[in-house]
Amino acid sequence: MVEQTKDQLSAFHYHMLDFLLTKSEKVTFTDSFIWLTSAIQTYFSTLCVSLTPSPSDFVTKLADGEARFSASKINASCYLIEDGSGRRFHLACRQDEEIPEGLPDVVASFLNQSMKQERLYNKTIYQKKIYKMTELFHSLLDQTDVLKQLLESLTSTFSLFEFSLFISHDQDQCLGIPAKELYMEGEKSDSFALKVYLSGDILRKNESVAYIPIKGQQGTYGVLKAEGTGDSFLTDACLDEMSLLANAAGKAFENAQLYEQSKASIANLELINETSRRLNQRLTLTDTMNDLAVRMAESFQAEEVGFFHIDHFENLTLLPGSTAFFKEAKPSDFYNELKEKLYEGEKGVFIGNGQSVFGKAGYGSLMAAPMIQNDRLLGFAVLLKQELYAFTFEMYKLFQALIHHATLAVTNSMLRDRLEHLVKTDQLTELYSRAYLDEKIQYSMKIHQKGVFILVDIDNFKNVNDTYGHQTGDEILIQVASVIKSNIRKHDVGARWGGEELAIYLPNVPVAVGKRITERLVYAVRKNTKPEVTISCGISCWTTETKKSLKELVHEADEALYSAKRSGKNRLMIHDSIK
């Protein structure tokens, strides 16, 4: 009888192995269990051996983890086969018989192998599904479609969980999906979502709730909240799978964003090129500015367009093409503030809420961009709109680019003014002419409270010409002029007075400041000329209390210069009338 049982066990074992090796990968654990019970009854019918699940514990769906079946003896005719997840099976025979030795271990091994095969098959199916989802994500070129597909994929794959999205404000503005905005503070803020957004790491709130970042290569774009319904727990395996999908969607979202940005960049470049082409076809300033105004109004839906030119006296002049709002009133203090900001190096001004500037009934949004040519501020353009926050930052950057490219056309149209300016400049030293200096001084005497005039003479200049030649003399003049330009302010005026004499006018400064600047010049010329030369300087000044004519101002500086020459040169003298 024992030998017969051994033969039955061997035949059963062989049949079981054949089944495991030849069965389709689609055969489930439940199907394998049904085959096993039938085979046991067939091979061990004489012993009435049966394999039955515990009614309340039999689970057809595999649990997470690597729980394995093992057999434990209850008595000679009954064994309990169970795994760590709570699934139990009873292997039993007639009470007057014994379970064949080795059969419980063979059954446990079969169940483990069947469970492993189903797990591998399910994993393969899952990986294919994830691959298809990822492939679908990357086929989408719209940010909204990517996030919608992410929610649909998660909902279909994890039916026992609810999902919600947190999107940053700059992303939420252009997405038409149900998403919560990420608030940095306040009652609406979610500290867990914010922490995940800033760190880019997964964060568990409890056993059934977790926050998962949606991130690409360049940053985090949002946060996914997964929340179990009812008594559902969020296992580590599920969380890893959700994170895998979120990462795939994050990269696809980033690619879609870059694609949309590239399309916008191409459209902007086309707009800039077309604008530049049209503007450069025009010859007159009026035609150029009118065309530019139309393009600004169309591109940004601006209600008011203004163009300002800054002349050599820093006065604001309204250019053609400006709309009625700017024509009806003189430039206000605010426009002068814009000018000063741009003079200080600002690349533009962007105001989303202009009520503090124009009042509650005025314009709500403003953009201003400078017109710069060869590092010189020629003017600026202003766009206005009634609606608050009507201009986006992207529009602002495009506006800056358009004005930057249009400036060349505007500059060409203003060539006459530029040529007039060149006429006012000494060709050799690139300092202003004496006539322009006179004009500047007279203008300053009208609008300022004081001013300093400095007359400069290069000592022994005739000896330089006689010793080194007139070409070297010219080079000395250029070197001294360069020192002057590098030691005075942008609004000060350095001029070629005549021959080896140069002049400087410092508007709206006291004589003490003029003295310090002149001392610096005397030292700098001696150190920065080759061959080395020195200068003598005479200083005069005017104030509203001691009003002087231009002729008197020049005469006093000339007398002070003569005193410096008589006192040994290489020095400065202040006119005796100045105390």
UniProtKB/Swiss-Prot annotation:
SUPFAM superfamilies: GAF domain-like (SSF55781), Nucleotide cyclase (SSF55073)
Native organism taxonomy: Bacteria, Bacillati, Bacillota, Bacilli, Bacillales
Any Pfam family the entry gives: GGDEF
Annotated GO biological process: cell adhesion involved in single-species biofilm formation; negative regulation of bacterial-type flagellum-dependent cell motility
GO cellular component labels: plasma membrane
Name recorded for this polypeptide: Uncharacterized protein YtrP
Domain GGDEF: 449-577
PROSITE patterns: GGDEF
GO molecular function, a single term: diguanylate cyclase activity
InterPro entries linked: Diguanylate_Cyclase, GAF-like_dom_sf, GGDEF_dom, Nucleotide_cyclase, Rev_trsase/Diguanyl_cyclase
